[in-house]
Amino acid sequence: MISEPMGFYTDTTVCIGCKACEVACKEWNQLPTSVDNLLEMSGDSYDNTRRLDGTHWRHVKFIEQFSEDRSDGRWLMMSDVCKHCVRAPCLEVCPTGAIIRTEFDTVVIQSDTCNGCRACIAACPFGVIGVNLCSF
């Protein structure tokens, strides 16, 4: 019996940008908290992760909208993750079979099988895949 595909929905109208979902994703997938335990701050934003990469699989992006004099503004939150494409280009180009589709219909990279060729990075139309330097 094939399980019914499931999704992860983030209601950005109630998101406060606490990034607890980022932390939970890292914990669930056993990813390091940050490379060398340093946070990369952008200098002009509260968004400390800034992008998806090999150690950040979920990103809550802060979209900051301010008036010209910065006296009035608002934050909008946008959640970004792997799209788990039905026809996943990353899966199709992987020469070692390290990228698989699970029984839950999710696309997963098996780091123990990956040879680090980075073909998947070039193939991803959303720019989601990155290299986890801790794995190599």
Segments (PLM) and residue ranges:
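Non-ligating segments of multi-cofactor redox enzymes
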Residues: 1-136
